[in-house]
Swiss-Prot record:
GO biological process: translation
Protein family (similarity comment): Belongs to the universal ribosomal protein uS14 family.
Entry function: Binds 16S rRNA, required for the assembly of 30S particles and may also be responsible for determining the conformation of the 16S rRNA at the A site.
Annotated GO MF terms: rRNA binding; structural constituent of ribosome
Assembly, per entry: Part of the 30S ribosomal subunit. Contacts proteins S3 and S10.
Entries under InterPro entries matching the protein: Ribosomal_uS14, Ribosomal_uS14_bac/plastid
Native source species: Erythrobacter litoralis (strain HTCC2594)
Swiss-Prot/TrEMBL keywords: Ribonucleoprotein, Ribosomal protein, RNA-binding, rRNA-binding
Name of the protein in question: Small ribosomal subunit protein uS14
Disulfide bridge positions per record: none
Record bears the keyword ATP-binding: no
NCBIfam families: PRK08881.1
Length: 101
């Protein structure tokens, strides 16, 4: 089990990303638009710098839904490899079977 503070910090970041997503995307589009004047693009970049760092989507870490483990995460299931194996062996994940050939 991961530290509760790490899990809570990541949840807070997810909330911030969601809150600032529209504003961030709009400013990013303006900053990357080559057809606009350089001063407009600079202003957009300065406004982007005012947005909190934790509102950047790259700072969010994928974590297991059950344990909070940050490594070995499977996006399709939302859990880590260890939980995937345990739940798969118990038959709790529909359609997941042990391979045999």
């Amino acid at each position: 089990m991961a530290k509760l503070s790490s899990i809570n910090k990541n949840e807070k970041r997810k909330k911030l990303v969601k809150q600032y997503a529209a504003k961030y995307e709009k400013l990013k589009a303006i900053a990357n638009d080559k057809s606009l004047d350089e001063t407009e693009r600079l202003i957009a970049r300065l406004k982007m710098a005012e947005i909190p760092r934790n509102a950047n989507p790259t700072r969010v870490r994928n974590r297991c839904a059950t344990t909070g483990r940050p490594r070995g995460y499977y996006r399709k299931f939302g859990i880590n490899r260890i939980e995937l194996r345990d739940l798969g062996n118990k038959g709790l994940i529909p359609g997941l079977t042990k391979s045999s050939w």
